[in-house]
UniProtKB/Swiss-Prot annotation:
GO terms for molecular function: DNA-binding transcription factor activity, RNA polymerase II-specific; zinc ion binding. Residues 50-92 are annotated as: Disordered. It comes from Gibberella fujikuroi (strain CBS 195.34 / IMI 58289 / NRRL A-6831) (Bakanae and foot rot disease fungus). The keyword Nucleus applies. InterPro entries: Carb_Metab_Trans_Reg, Zn2-C6_fun-type_DNA-bd_sf, Zn2Cys6_DnaBD. The keyword Nucleus applies. This is Fusaric acid cluster transcription factor FUB10. The gene is FUB10. Keywords: Nucleus. Fusaric acid is phytotoxic to plants such as cotton and banana. It has been shown to induce programmed cell death in plants. In addition to a mild toxicity to animals, fusaric acid exhibits acanthamoebicidal, antioomycete, and antimycobacterial activities.
Length: 419
């Protein structure tokens, strides 16, 4: 019989399980092939030889039946089709009763290996699995910790901008570089505040006499802005400081042309800005000029209605200010002149950053300087946009023409100086 190794020749005998597992030659006594092999005899263990495989070419495998499941039928039915030729006349019931030995021991035995050879590998997998699970656990804990540290209140929708959550723009902040998009958002918030202030100063009464008061304090009255309602002059002054800082973030640094770099080229003129950025900056400037125009008009009307007397008549405790050791008299006209020069200096900084031409400025521009060439409206394209926007304001009917508010402020400030 092909599977009986006792009738085989010595050179066709099967190796024992131990030699087969170690892939070694199984040496036996040539006269006694059924005895234990020399390696097992030397080791003093039992020599076990499993059922031998038949020698020669293995028989061709029978074709397995293909199972087709019909999807349309509600009941689970299967049809078997034989892909082998029908010449043999094989019965389908015999094919279904065919036993397949797919055990692990049989598969390993067919390739000359034993299941015990994988014990070491199983131990390795057991040792690796806790490591991988610990790594996945640590990654999950880190991700969970990061998710817990995120404040849900800071998650905002990209469809709307919350201006209240933007950082403050006070002059005491450090001069950090800001993106132009961020500056545009801050300019939009400033524009909204100036619009509300312009409406309030036109519709609500305010203390005109307090504009000319001289006071001496360790802290400016602007420090009480968050605690109580401030004077319109303080509010617009704070808006000027904020606008000056934002314009500095949009304009290229003036030292760029004096600092050559061997690795990168820095242009002397600022990069071209978007139309929205230029228009919103110009609108903020026009609103500030309009607010100052209303304030100085009220102040000039107040000076005309009162006599040129000392402020001691309406100030409870007159203070004496000194400049160069000389006392400054508490006079209304002098207070008005000081206020005009202060506002001119404040507007000059903004107009210099914007690069406005002479006929669009409130302050006087020095003839020997080129402070407007590097401003926002210093380029030819920006000048064209500025002229178009100003001309549009001149053509429409109303009392809030843009160029007229600049001229009106210059006239009333000159009148206060000459009063």
């Amino acid at each position: 019989m092909a599977g009986d190794f006792s009738n085989r020749a010595p050179w066709k005998r099967s190796a024992c399980d131990r030699c087969r597992a170690q892939k070694l030659r199984c040496h036996r006594d040539s006269g006694h092939s059924t005895d234990a092999c020399l390696r097992c005899l030397k080791s003093g263990i039992e020599c076990v030889t499993s059922k031998a495989r038949p020698t020669g070419r293995p028989p061709s495998r029978q074709v397995q039946p293909t199972v087709v499941v019909e999807q349309g039928d509600t009941s689970s039915s299967s049809h078997t089709t034989d892909s082998s030729p029908s010449a043999g006349g094989t019965d389908m019931s015999n094919m279904m009763n065919f036993e397949y030995d797919l055990s692990l021991d049989n598969i390993l035995d067919s390739i000359g290996m034993q299941h015990s050879d994988f014990i070491v590998n199983d131990n390795i997998l057991v040792d690796i699995s806790p490591l991988s699970s610990s790594q996945s656990t640590s990654q999950h804990s880190v991700a969970q910790a990061q998710a817990q540290t995120v404040d849900p209140s800071t998650i905002q929708s990209t469809a709307s901008y919350q201006f209240n959550t933007l950082p403050s723009t006070s002059s005491m902040d450090s001069a950090l570089p800001m993106r132009s998009d961020h500056v545009e958002l801050l300019l939009s918030r400033l524009h909204s505040k100036l619009s509300a202030q312009l409406y309030s100063i036109r519709s609500s009464p305010w203390d005109v006499k307090g504009t000319l008061n001289l006071s001496l304090a360790h802290q400016g009255i602007g420090q009480d802005f968050e605690n109580c309602e401030s004077h319109p002059l303080v509010q617009v002054s704070q808006a000027c400081t904020e606008l000056e800082r934002l314009l500095s973030g949009l304009r290229a640094p003036a030292s760029a042309e004096h600092t050559p770099s061997t690795f990168s080229y820095t242009p002397a003129v600022p990069p071209r800005l978007r139309i929205t950025q230029l228009l919103i900056a110009l609108s903020c400037y026009i609103q500030i000029v309009s607010i100052y125009g209303i304030i100085f008009s009220k102040v000039f009307d107040y000076l005309l209605s009162t006599s040129k007397t000392s402020v001691g008549s309406y100030q409870s405790s007159p203070l004496t200010l000194y400049i160069g050791g000389l006392p400054i008299p508490p006079n209304e006209t002098l207070s008005g002149n000081l206020l005009v020069h202060l506002i001119e200096h404040q507007l000059h900084q903004i107009e210099q950053l914007m690069g406005l031409p002479e006929h669009y400025r409130v302050s006087s521009r020095a003839k020997d300087t080129k402070d407007g060439e590097l401003g926002l409206f210093g380029s030819q394209h920006s000048q064209s946009l500025l002229n178009a926007a100003i001309q549009l304001g001149e053509d429409r009917d109303g009392n809030h023409d843009d160029i007229r508010c600049v001229r009106a402020l210059k006239i009333v400030m000159r009148q206060i100086k000459d009063f």
